[in-house]
């Protein structure tokens, strides 16, 4: 088993004890909740006559079901209105901090917690959402959990978990122009597979990650779960501290200096032992596009849909299913695939740096005829910053719609949905069948800059041609 890693140190510091089942009872330092997976958990507490044990360690927002166009209350969707009212009432009843629409800090839960400084190194973090691993970018151990586990954390501030193995994923070198953090994680998942990380936590390391800003690191950690890993993290460093300093909930004054000293102490030791190590060369990564129905079915933008015989035997069945569903054939170049909808946003790529990169492509150009393209900022703060920088005008002048914050078309629990057999270029994290709202809709995952390029060209294209 691993030894001396950040994961081991944080795990040990938060271990309450060992349960009769053999599972570890792990204390959770920060619990993030939203409107979709929390109502049932609160109902279960009421049934048992329990209260939220640590409301001060619980933070809520609305993101999954909020519309990104008309946000007037009550919402047109009565179920969405009911769910948000339930969260409002549950937070008020339990004295939980709640960032509602119009608060100035509402947004996708995995965007607002870092920008508020709630997410910090050395924490254990849980949320009823698969992509909680995003927070690992700060050197935190962050888990997505189910509704019954949301109940457990509300009631006890602990989770019953098995300790993970730790795989070090090292990427070294400089990324080529037009290659982004999204391409890095898609390349990793493509190589190791969607089940390759099962039973592991991923430690992302190497000179490539050292050069990334915090938002890029969040993109990578966000999708660790898509590679089968339970969590993913990057050791904290000066980039981490510079991002956190001065944020709302970051330590201040002398407390800041103490915090940095402690954060430095929990980094993986130089001689840390890992259960596995995989090394990648950044120069070998190109702009990447998924062609199939899992995030692991990715190829370089100038490559072709793989032939069955090029795949591992265990991957061929899902590939055959993907050929049929996506209406693509083996050997078909992915470049030139016609697009109907272009979506820039999500907890993977809805931050200000993502919008800046997409705006560089959109500036002075226009969305191709017949393409629906829209940009959804990850939070109210991101939206405000983007508008201050004039990014909204760049997008709108180029023919993109500029929306209000929310999860939007990433998962289509809201009005933003594909129709029929439409195919989207999306900066989100999942390309499963029906993921974006239509049971027959198709999704191609790529970086925000690549989505913007597809919007301009009307088809999958190489972003490097527009740089």
Curated annotation (Swiss-Prot):
Swiss-Prot/TrEMBL catalytic activity: (2R,3S)-3-isopropylmalate = (2S)-2-isopropylmalate
Residue segments, region Disordered: 422-443
Protein keywords: 4Fe-4S, Amino-acid biosynthesis, Branched-chain amino acid biosynthesis, Iron, Iron-sulfur, Leucine biosynthesis, Lyase, Metal-binding
Top-level enzyme category: lyase
MF-aspect GO terms: 3-isopropylmalate dehydratase activity; 4 iron, 4 sulfur cluster binding; metal ion binding
Highest taxon, organism lineage: Bacteria
EC number(s) on file: 4.2.1.33
Protein family per UniProt: Belongs to the aconitase/IPM isomerase family. LeuC type 1 subfamily.
Primary role: Catalyzes the isomerization between 2-isopropylmalate and 3-isopropylmalate, via the formation of 2-isopropylmaleate.
Name the UniProt record assigns to this protein: 3-isopropylmalate dehydratase large subunit
Organism whose genome encodes this protein: Nostoc punctiforme (strain ATCC 29133 / PCC 73102)
Gene it is expressed from: leuC
């Amino acid at each position: 088993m691993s030894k001396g890693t950040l994961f081991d140190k944080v795990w040990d510091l938060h271990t309450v004890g060992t349960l009769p089942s053999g599972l570890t009872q792990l204390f959770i330092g920060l619990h993030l909740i939203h409107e979709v997976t929390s109502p049932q958990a609160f109902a279960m507490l009421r049934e048992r006559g329990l209260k939220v044990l640590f409301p001060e360690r619980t933070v809520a927002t609305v993101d999954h079901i909020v519309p990104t166009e008309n946000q007037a209350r009550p919402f047109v969707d009565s179920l969405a209105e009911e769910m948000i009212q339930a969260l409002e009432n549950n937070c008020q009843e339990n004295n939980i901090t709640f960032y509602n629409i119009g608060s100035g800090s509402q947004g996708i839960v995995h965007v607002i917690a870092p920008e508020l400084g709630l997410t910090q190194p050395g924490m254990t973090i849980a949320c009823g959402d698969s992509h909680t691993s995003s927070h690992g970018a700060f050197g935190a151990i962050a888990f997505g959990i189910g509704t019954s586990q949301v109940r457990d954390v509300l009631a006890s501030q602990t989770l019953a978990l098995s300790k993970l193995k730790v795989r070090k994923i090292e990427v070294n070198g400089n990324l080529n122009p037009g290659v982004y953090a999204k391409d890095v994680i898609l390349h990793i998942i493509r190589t190791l597979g969607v089940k390759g990380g099962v039973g592991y936590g991923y430690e992302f390391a190497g000179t490539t990650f050292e050069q990334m800003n915090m938002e890029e690191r969040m993109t990578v950690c966000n999708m660790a779960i898509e590679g089968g890993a339970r969590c993913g993290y990057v050791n904290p460093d000066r980039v981490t501290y510079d991002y956190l300093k001065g944020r709302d909930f970051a330590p201040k004054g002398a407390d800041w200096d103490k915090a940095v000293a402690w954060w430095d102490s929990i980094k993986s030791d130089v001689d840390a032992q890992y259960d596995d190590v995989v090394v990648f060369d950044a120069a070998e990564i190109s702009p990447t596009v998924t062609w199939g129905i899992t995030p692991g079915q990715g190829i370089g933008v100038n490559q072709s849909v793989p032939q069955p015989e090029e795949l591992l035997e265990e991957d061929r069945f899902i590939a055959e299913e993907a050929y049929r569903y996506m209406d693509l054939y083996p050997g078909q170049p992915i470049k030139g695939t016609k697009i109907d909808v272009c979506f820039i946003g999500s907890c993977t790529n809805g931050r200000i740096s993502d919008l800046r990169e997409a705006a560089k492509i959109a500036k002075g150009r226009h969305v191709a005829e017949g393409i629906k393209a829209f940009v959804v900022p990850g939070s109210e703060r991101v939206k405000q910053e983007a508008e201050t920088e004039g990014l909204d005008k760049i997008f709108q002048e180029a023919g993109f719609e500029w929306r209000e914050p929310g999860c939007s078309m990433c998962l289509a629990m809201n009005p933003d949905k594909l129709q029929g057999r439409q195919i989207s270029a999306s900066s989100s994290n999942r390309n499963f069948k029906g993921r974006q709202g239509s049971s027959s809709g198709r999704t191609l995952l790529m970086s925000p800059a690549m989505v913007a390029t597809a919007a301009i060209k009307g088809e999958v294209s190489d972003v490097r041609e527009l740089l």
